[in-house]
Regions:
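Active-site-adjacent mobile loop/cap segments within catalytic or ligand-binding domains
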Residues: 97, 104, 141-205
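A generic structural signal for alpha->beta connector loops
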Residues: 51, 110, 140-141, 157
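Extracytoplasmic/secreted envelope proteins and their assembly/folding machinery
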Residues: 37-44, 81-84, 122-129, 150, ...
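Catalytic-core regions of hydrolytic enzymes
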Residues: 5-123
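Sec-exported extracytoplasmic/periplasmic mature domains
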Residues: 41-52, 88-92, 100, 129-137, ...
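Single conserved hydrophobic/aromatic residue that forms the stacking wall/gate
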Residues: 1-3
Length: 205
């Protein structure tokens, strides 16, 4: 068993997308990148209040690409590599990446957590997924999943999860995700789940 001690850990808070990369569009035309940032800022503020060290990868609606990236594709690739590098250079990091889901069929809803192959990632994802179901949305019976080709999770070596906070294609869930009240509750669930994980031993995968 390995233990992560809260006092020595930095939670890397990643608001997915940003700048010209808006991510997906909601059913009312809201950009995913903006919602990701709103939720990530709430998560970061709550961690600060609780005394947990954090590092936010972006605090504004910007991309993290290199200035010499000339095309949209090059800028997107450069941006995601920068997120990997910033996470990897953070001592004792645990990565929490915030995203939103989208699907052509409007009926799908519910937050879901994806986890990296790195030790501790699955344990963190299971804790967060359970908390999202029991404390945020009792109708959410989704299970966490191992990330497939998610570049960020595939290339970091620390415990890492990506949280799809909900489906922007579902009108009811999209409306909730835009409200400060729901964002605050979501942030509280994620923060508490993360801190519980940091204070307990986990079995190496």
């Amino acid at each position: 068993y390995t233990t992560l001690f809260r006092s020595g850990t930095t939670v890397v808070v990643d608001a997915g997308h940003g700048g010209e990369d808006g991510g997906t569009l909601s059913c009312t035309g809201v950009r995913e990148s903006g919602l990701n940032l709103e939720i990530a800022l709430r998560v970061n503020d709550l961690f600060a209040l609780l005394g947990q060290r954090t590092r936010m990868l972006r605090t504004q609606d910007v991309s993290l690409h290199d200035t010499d990236a000339a095309t949209i594709a090059a800028r997107k690739a450069s941006d995601i590599r920068a997120r990997v590098r910033l996470t990897e250079e953070t001592p004792k990091a645990v990565l929490l990446s915030i995203h939103q889901n989208h699907f052509p069929e409007l009926k799908y809803r519910g937050a879901q957590v994806f986890y990296a192959a790195a030790d501790g990632s699955r344990a963190l994802a299971e804790r967060l997924q359970t908390a999202l179901g029991t404390q945020l949305d009792p109708d959410n019976h989704r299970s966490c999943k191992k990330a497939g080709e998610i570049y960020l999770l595939k290339h970091v070596s620390c415990p890492a999860v990506l949280v799809e906070c909900g489906f922007l294609s579902n009108p009811a869930e999209e409306a909730l995700l835009r409200t400060p009240e729901y964002q605050k509750k979501l942030a509280a669930v994620l923060c508490c789940g993360m801190l519980e994980f940091l204070e307990e031993p986990y079995e190496s995968c």
